[in-house]
Curated annotation (Swiss-Prot):
The lineage of its organism: Bacteria, Pseudomonadati, Pseudomonadota, Gammaproteobacteria, Pseudomonadales. Required for insertion of 4Fe-4S clusters for at least IspG. It comes from Pseudomonas fluorescens (strain SBW25). GO terms for biological process: iron-sulfur cluster assembly. Homodimer. This is Iron-sulfur cluster insertion protein ErpA.
Length: 116
């Protein structure tokens, strides 16, 4: 019997997302704020993404830093987000943080709901 090691695929935090987080943190005047990304049950496809700003980081959170700002993910959410990319997009329909998730087998037209 052989033992295999597993290295989780990193969560990517794009320049555009980091730049927007920095802008929002500067606007609030609180450099302790971090972008927390999470997954909850719900939405039309079974799971949905959520974003919030948070000052607190738990011991078991995953932290991704880029350009002086941090993205934080709890362990339950990370299992669904490993290998995903968090980006910020501006378009005709508005501006928002988006997740490009290779683990999602289906997604909803709204872009915030998915299934695995």
């Amino acid at each position: 019997m052989s033992v295999e090691s597993f290295t989780p695929t990193a969560l990517q935090f794009t320049h555009g997302a980091a730049h927007k987080v920095k802008s929002l943190v500067d606007e609030e005047g609180n450099d302790r704020l971090k972008l927390r990304v999470f997954v909850t049950g719900g939405g039309c496809s079974g799971f949905q993404y959520g974003f919030t700003f948070d000052e607190d980081v738990a011991d078991d959170d995953t932290i991704v830093e880029r350009e002086g700002v941090s993205l934080v993910v709890d362990p339950m959410s990370f299992q669904y987000l490993a290998g995903a990319e968090v980006d910020y997009q501006e378009g005709l329909e508005g501006s928002r943080f988006v997740i490009k998730n290779p683990n999602a087998t289906t997604t909803c037209g709204c872009g915030s709901s998915f299934s695995i």
